[in-house]
Amino acid sequence: MKKDALIVAAALSAALGLVGGALAGRNLAKGHGPARSHADSRTSLVPRFAPHLGDLVTALHAPPGKPAPPPKPAAKSQPRPALHLRGTTMSIYEHTAHPWVLAEQGCSAAQRHENGVVVLDFGKPAHKHHGYGTILFSGRFAPNHKITTAMVGYSRGYVRCLPKGSTASITLARGTSNYHPSVPSAYTAGVRWARATNKLGRILAQEGLAEHVEAAAADDAEPAWDPSFHKTKQFFHGFRAAVHGHTLYDYGSLDGGIGAVWSAKQAWYVAGGIRHTKALPEIYNSAMAQEWAELAAIAHGRYHRDVRFAGVMTQGSASCRCGLRPHAAHRILAHALHARGVGHTVLPRGGTNIIG
């Protein structure tokens, strides 16, 4: 009887040792193991490849004389599901051209899983110290080369903070406007803007960032800021002459519709009428959607071409009710296009919401 008791005690001691080892492994993994995702921690605190405690308990209760069931093989790791990519990006009115500030902006965009067109608006064209650049929204002058460096910072931050294996990508557009450009030549300003965009594209390729970031340019072209259309046309013409395949987005307005300030030909010119241009129209209310639908109908009927939309632009934040939200803006523009008989016009889902 004593001998049998010793045998049972030994078996029980060995089983408890196995349980203790598993628990020790769990505590070790929590304290010093590699960092894991929040999703993993919700699933189990036991290391993925450790024996499951349930298997050990089963072994303790196995009938005498029968071998303990073999441990279950470790489950094959499943491929991580693709993260949901946001169809609406955040664009920014920039107050600085410090690359470390824009790197944080890029990292935040990656953490939001943004995917699409991002416009960094650096303000109106300007000229100072024999160089072209812009007046930032802080009122300071930023030369073109510093704007390029800032955009490289944004790109690095975005790529660095993307989850491993992410397929997200953005088109990063160097934004300006036609608001009273303080430059000797609007045409030269357009040429320099294109060359800076080309340079950003080369840097992205050289640094291995081009898989996730594409270089582009953008212009907030608004009729009220240039009623004669002269400087706006010269800027776009200069850009077209020097660009190497990069897109120039028009993220402006039509200010009352066709004929109120600009003619149909002028509005069409900057919204897809010339090479390398696309429209990313401001749709802050339903009236703006109607104006862009009118242009699309005229372009289709008169020029036998469709406006090349790249989505919509909205503005504001949670603390500012500044018009339509992105999904509502897209829906209202789509309805306006359909009502005008040009519902076939391609209107990509999503767009961008600008803050600053």
Protein language model features and the residues they cover:
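N-terminal export and membrane-targeting signals
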Residues: M1-L12
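N-terminal cationic leader/targeting segments used for protein routing and processing
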Residues: K3-D4, L28-G31, P67, P73, ...
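Core hydrophobic alpha-helical transmembrane segments of single-pass membrane proteins
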Residues: A10-G21
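C-terminal region of N-terminal signal peptides and the immediate post-cleavage residues
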Residues: V19-F49, L53
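Glycan-processing catalytic domains of CAZymes
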Residues: L45-G65, P71-G356
